[in-house]
Design a protein with these regions (language model features):
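A membrane-topology feature that recognizes alpha-helical transmembrane segments
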Residues: 1-325
């Protein structure tokens, strides 16, 4: 029996084709189901509602969604993106999040098999997805999910260290739990300092109307962003933090410039009926870019680092970062 169970700890690429397809398909379905739950989290957490009860309902006619209409991805396709009862449109975000969940499950199992590192990677991606969409919707970072992400990093690190010893490797941050602790603390302090300095500078910079770019009482960046970077530090270790912040800043700047140039940041109106705050015309949530930077660093950190250092004139790029091994 134990030998049969151990089979699933083997990466699918080392299994016979039929077994590999079965394991990966099961991982995709499992991930898509969690993606469906993630949609509930994204919709309810900002409102302070329970993610367990009541059951999901159509937001327009409030008819309870039955099991046959709640099959990840498939139900949305079969219903042609409309509620079965009232015909109201169903956002493409729902199947997109479910697809992301399925891909996350597949990638985690493909890389590690059914193991603790796979569970760690899966939880890491899904929590970042939830944080990102909530930040996009509300310009607010959900503290509870940031705490959960920190717990994933430290919890899995400690668990693997207890089970496999101090020489354990193969997780998101190599083999040292101390690296994760340092990463979380240093990353949070680092970005907090950047927020303070940027705020001081931008309060002295005037816009076209002669007003400070950052009015008194406001900050250049939300304080949820340092919390996200700290949580990423607890997951990836301190070595990954400079690259994570660099990637997030570059990608965020490029996308922000494109959105502003195309006029997509204007006339956005209030965040919601419950939150009358209207984002400035040049405001773009930074949380999703931090999340993307963290995922890119986790998967491609060594490769990016090895190519980036020579471009910056800092040597041959040797393997200085430790991510997925």
């Amino acid at each position: 029996m134990l030998d049969d169970l151990a089979l699933f700890a083997v990466p699918p690429r080392e299994l016979p084709l039929v077994a590999a397809v079965f394991v990966l398909a099961a991982a995709f379905i499992f991930g898509a189901l969690w993606g469906s739950f993630l949609n509930v989290v994204i919709a309810r957490v900002p409102r302070g509602q329970s993610v367990v009860t009541p059951r999901s309902r159509c937001p327009k006619c409030e008819t309870m969604i039955t099991a046959r209409d709640n099959i990840p991805i498939l139900s949305w396709l079969l219903l042609r993106a409309k509620c079965r009862h009232c015909g109201a449109g169903i956002s493409a975000r729902y199947p997109m999040v479910e697809l992301i969940g399925g891909v996350a499950g597949t990638v985690a199992v493909a890389r590690f098999g059914v193991t603790l590192p796979a569970a760690e990677l899966f939880c890491f991606i899904l929590i970042l997805v939830a944080i990102s969409f909530i930040d996009l919707d509300t310009f607010r970072v959900p503290t509870g999910l940031v705490v959960a992400l920190s717990a994933v990093g430290l919890g899995f690190g400690l668990l693997r260290w207890q089970l496999l010893g101090p020489e354990a490797s193969g997780g998101l941050a190599g083999d040292d739990v101390v690296d994760r602790l340092i990463g979380g603390v240093v990353a949070g302090i680092m970005l907090s300092c950047i927020v303070i300095v940027a705020t001081g500078v931008l309060r002295r910079v005037k816009d076209k109307d002669g007003n400070p770019r950052v009015p008194p009482g406001e900050w250049a960046m939300g304080w949820g962003d340092p919390m996200i970077l700290a949580a990423l530090g607890f997951c990836l270790g301190w070595q990954a933090m400079p690259l994570t912040l660099f990637l997030a800043s570059v990608i965020g700047s490029v996308i922000g410039i494109v959105l502003k140039a195309t006029g997509q940041l204007k006339d956005r109106g209030p965040i919601s009926d419950d939150d009358p705050w209207i984002p400035p015309d040049d405001a773009v949530p930074f949380g999703p870019f931090l999340a993307l930077g963290g995922v890119l660093a986790a998967f491609f950190g060594d490769a990016i680092h090895a190519r980036l250092l020579p471009l910056l004139g800092l040597g041959d790029g040797g393997v200085l970062l430790r991510y997925l091994e």
